[in-house]
Amino acid sequence: MPQNTLNIVILAAGKGTRMYSKMPKVLHRIGGKPMVGRVIDTAAALNPQNICVVIGHGKEQVLDTVKRDVVWVEQTEQLGTGHAVKTALPHLSAEGRTLVLYGDVPLIDVETLETLLEAAGNEVGLLTDVPNDPTGLGRIIRDSNGSVTAIVEEKDADAVQKAVKEINTGILVLPNAKLENWLNSLSSNNAQGEYYLTDLIAKAVADGIKVHPVQVRASHLAAGVNNKLQLTELERIFQTEQAQELLKAGVTLRDPARFDLRGRLKHGQDVVIDVNCIFEGDIELGDNVEIGANCVIKNAKIGANSKIAPFSHLESCEVGENNRIGPYARLRPQARLADDVHVGNFVEIKNAAIGKGTKANHLTYIGDAEVGCKTNFGAGTIIANYDGVHKHKTVIGDEVRIGSNCVLVAPVTLGNKVTTGAGSTITRNVEDNKLALARARQTVIEGWVRPEKDKQ
């Protein structure tokens, strides 16, 4: 039996009633990714022959959310873990081994599974744990020699068996040559009326096949999620581990307990991240980047020596070197900032290229635009890029000075060194070095009397 032929079955069909959610349990997220997606990633890292994911409750949602190249198998009736694996049998090879994982055990890692597979060899591998509280979990039963003889679910256990602290995590390695016969011989004559996968341990022992237990090195690696409390506990463990890795790599986290990474973070040296920041997707931070408190950054690249002030939101954007962003700034998708750009409070930029040294220090909207170098936006500048049907582009040259409270109505082009007077609405192109004024002349009415209410 070739030991290198590996099938993986991931059980993900349960209802998750204790989550009190319309969303299938396995789609609830850890670190920004659905739990079952994390398990698939871990499984794929083992380079198996195939991965079968058994789904049932909310299968349409699972398929719509987790778009992965795996074998999807439907369990139409939830009749237990043994029945779930049986539904995957047609997709498993006749020889080799099958590793059984769970879509609601999101933190299982490659190292643990490789250890289990090595220990199992061509026989049976069983991942166990000794938690502080084994209540509700299946107990590992051993004989006088310490060999595993069975797993007894708590509802079927007697007082002596319930006193056992070692529990079954559910993760198993099974020989394919025996798997079909063992599954076909399962009985549902138990307290749950289900076909228990755990009953295969006793069948292996009866067939003279050794069971190799491996105790997980940390309980959270094999911990399942049945409710929102357990979900948040694993989320915090996951985030703590990520924070520790960043600290070891030289990133300064002002408070590791108030840091969330929901993706991948690539960083240079001397990066500083303040409290309550959330990072999603793929993030790249250059040398000496500082992220202020309460920022949300998603799929962004930030160049060296740039400072992001508190309460700023950056999504799908590129920020050059030596930028000053925020506080309360928003960079939306396709915002592309060159070096030495200043974006101040309550400035929003979307689908726009901003040239080197340009400043928009406050209360400005820049959308669908191309802006040159060393241009300055006065407070309250708005680029009106949408006519109700289509978006239009605005082009602004180098060293342009846009007065406060101006509206640039796209499509429009401002040449180099153009100046616009405060309060202007610019609707036509302006050539280089010109001053554009587009506002009503002020009128002062002499002798005007302010009306007052009648006093009665």
UniProtKB/Swiss-Prot annotation:
The keyword Transmembrane helix does not apply. It comes from Neisseria meningitidis serogroup B (strain ATCC BAA-335 / MC58). It catalyses: alpha-D-glucosamine 1-phosphate + acetyl-CoA = N-acetyl-alpha-D-glucosamine 1-phosphate + CoA + H(+); N-acetyl-alpha-D-glucosamine 1-phosphate + UTP + H(+) = UDP-N-acetyl-alpha-D-glucosamine + diphosphate. This is Bifunctional protein GlmU. PANTHER family: BIFUNCTIONAL PROTEIN GLMU, NUCLEOTIDYL TRANSFERASE. The lineage of its organism: Bacteria, Pseudomonadati, Pseudomonadota, Betaproteobacteria, Neisseriales. Binds 1 Mg(2+) ion per subunit. In the N-terminal section; belongs to the N-acetylglucosamine-1-phosphate uridyltransferase family. The active site is at residue 362. One of its GO terms (cellular component) is membrane. The keyword Transferase applies. Its main location: cytoplasm. Keywords: Acyltransferase, Cell shape, Cell wall biogenesis/degradation, Cytoplasm, Magnesium, Metal-binding, Multifunctional enzyme, Nucleotidyltransferase, Peptidoglycan synthesis, Repeat, Transferase. Catalyzes the last two sequential reactions in the de novo biosynthetic pathway for UDP-N-acetylglucosamine (UDP-GlcNAc). The C-terminal domain catalyzes the transfer of acetyl group from acetyl coenzyme A to glucosamine-1-phosphate (GlcN-1-P) to produce N-acetylglucosamine-1-phosphate (GlcNAc-1-P), which is converted into UDP-GlcNAc by the transfer of uridine 5-monophosphate (from uridine 5-triphosphate), a reaction catalyzed by the N-terminal domain. Homotrimer. Acetyl-CoA binds at residues 379, 385-386, 404, 422, 439. Pfam families: Hexapep, NTP_transf_3. InterPro entries: Bifunctional_GlmU, GlmU-like, GlmU_C_LbH, Hexapep, MobA-like_NTP_Trfase, Nucleotide-diphossugar_trans, Trimer_LpxA-like_sf. It is found in: Cytoplasm. Mg(2+) binds at residues 104, 226. Pathway: Nucleotide-sugar biosynthesis; UDP-N-acetyl-alpha-D-glucosamine biosynthesis; N-acetyl-alpha-D-glucosamine 1-phosphate from alpha-D-glucosamine 6-phosphate (route II): step 2/2; Nucleotide-sugar biosynthesis; UDP-N-acetyl-alpha-D-glucosamine biosynthesis; UDP-N-acetyl-alpha-D-glucosamine from N-acetyl-alpha-D-glucosamine 1-phosphate: step 1/1; Bacterial outer membrane biogenesis; LPS lipid A biosynthesis. Residues 250-456 are annotated as: N-acetyltransferase. UDP-N-acetyl-alpha-D-glucosamine binds at residues 11-14, 25, 75, 80-81, 102-104, 138, 153, 168, 226, 332, 350, 365, 376. Its EC number is 2.7.7.23, 2.3.1.157. GO terms for biological process: cell morphogenesis; cell wall organization; lipid A biosynthetic process; peptidoglycan biosynthetic process; regulation of cell shape; UDP-N-acetylglucosamine biosynthetic process.
